[in-house]
């Protein structure tokens, strides 16, 4: 069993999934299951030379303050919220949507997946876990119909059964048994990508067993959205698709109004933490573990607030 991680925004190292791997390993060991082979792909390095948009915004704001006595908060409100979305999401997202950078990112992911398959030629089962923008990239790679014939996405499709016919009889192909997405805005960005859910259904129909897709949403993550209704999946079918929620008590209802100016800063940091915390949550690792081994009963019974539901 191979488990391939695809990270989301702001990640620039390959250790982002280590804590989650440890939790999954522990969960599998408790269940008497064999530990899979993990691989943390890393495409963030492609973005190291791209401009940091918020630096330009901050420079303009500083220049404004030098020449004006007006409080910057009166002419540019919610700056901490804006900084969060620009620095921690939009910067990487719109860079991926750039044709050249997007091609390069898909190339990096393709080469890393091919490296993994070459290193473990006897493994026939692939599972993909994608976070944030990584989920959007995965959706794009697997099912977009807009790429040119030489796009790296087709290298990935060529090694996954059901996505493309292998051109060589001896070519290695693996079965994609499960997908787990975490904190991903596929719902929003598919309006731009224009990918038909029918492509997913067609792919899933080529497998004897249902393809499992668990989409995990943390309650306070503003970038995470359910996808089941938008995909219009006729359940039961060859696709097992579940939106699963990770709950948390909404303390901001009572505390935010009393924080004054600190409220915006605190909430901005809270939003960032909510979006990145999937890598550290035991409830997330348990859902992934259940998805890896096909324990659909455990997935369906998962309680948003309880850790030990199985």
Name every feature range the model reports, one short phrase each.
Residues 1-59, 91-129, 133-310:
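Lipid deacylating catalytic domains
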Residues 63-104, 133:
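Extended, charge-rich helix/loop segments that form flexible
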